[in-house]
Amino acid sequence: SVRLVKGSHIVTRRLFEHDHAYIFQNPDKRIIFAIPYEHDYTLIGTTDIEYRGDPAQVAITADETQYLCDSINRYFRQKISPADVRWTYSGVRPLLEEEGADNPSAVTRDYSLELDAPAGEAPLLSVFGG
């Protein structure tokens, strides 16, 4: 079966002058990145939260915003708060359900292919996971 996992991102003022990206590992073992974005901004992400709502209505939560700010503040001298967030975006991705994987971050990023090819009809290839 498929499990929906939400990833959210924040965009803040530019936090560093060069064009290199950073990748950090948090104490909870999650990876966070900070990437130069559109010359004047820094793109920070991502969260990894199980999602049970309508994928068309996905949005970042206050807790996710704070998590990303706290994550960056652990590593950068220039501190940020939710008030520094210029905009956000979120998305939902389907991951393969894994027995015993309660934490969305622990779910495999592997994929599965299913081919439905009834005789005399066009085949349908479905890709799950990622």
Predicted regions and their residues:
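C-terminal catalytic lobe of FAD-dependent flavoproteins
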Residues: 1-44, 49-130
